[in-house]
Swiss-Prot record:
InterPro entries assigned to the protein according to its UniProt record, in alphabetical order: DnaJ_domain, HscB, HscB_C_sf, HscB_oligo_C, J_dom_sf
Organism, scientific name: Burkholderia thailandensis (strain ATCC 700388 / DSM 13276 / CCUG 48851 / CIP 106301 / E264)
Assembly: Interacts with HscA and stimulates its ATPase activity.
Gene that this sequence comes from: hscB
Function as written in the Swiss-Prot or TrEMBL entry: Co-chaperone involved in the maturation of iron-sulfur cluster-containing proteins. Seems to help targeting proteins to be folded toward HscA.
Name under which the protein is recorded: Co-chaperone protein HscB homolog
Molecular function (Gene Ontology), one example: protein-folding chaperone binding
Taxonomic path: Bacteria, Pseudomonadati, Pseudomonadota, Betaproteobacteria, Burkholderiales
Keywords: Chaperone
Amino acid sequence: MVSLKDSHFELFHLPAQFALDEPTLDAAYRAVQSQVHPDRFAAAGDAQKRVAMQWATRANEAYQTLRDPLKRATYLLHLRGVDVGAENNTAMEPAFLMQQMEWRERIEDAAAAKNVGELDALLDELRDERRARLAKLGSLLDSGSDQGAAEAVRQLMFVERVSAEIGAQIERLEH
C-alpha cells in the first residue's frame, strides 16, 4: 500500500532514476487518478472527500515533478540528500560563465537591433544546449555523480531562464 509520504516514484510504482519512459509515467498517473479522483467520492462523507482531494493533489504534484526533466533531477537529488542550492550556490565552471556572458551580449545586441531572427537563432541554440545538458545530467545521475549533477541542474536552470528571457524579448519585438 502506498502512503502519502512515499516518494513520487513509489506513488507511480516507477524506479527512482532519471531516465523515465513518459508513456509509462502517463499511464501510471492516469491509473492513480482514476482511483483517487474526487468525482469518485461525490457521494462519500466529508472525511473521505478530503482524503481523496489530498491524494489527487499529491498525484498531480508528483506527476508534474516527474514529467519535467529538470524538476525530476532536482527531486532525485533531494531523495539522495543533495541540495541543488540554486538560491545560494552560484559557483559555475569558468567556461559556462563565459558562455553566459556571450549569450547575454547576443541577446542585448539582437534586442537593440530589433533582430527577431537572431533571437530565434539563439533560442534554437539554447534548445540544443538544453538537450545536450539534459543528456549529460542523466549520465551524471546514473553514475552517482550527485555533486556534478547538482551543478548541471543549476546550469540548466540558467539555460531555461535565458530561454524564457529570449522568448519574452521576441514577444515584445513582435507586438
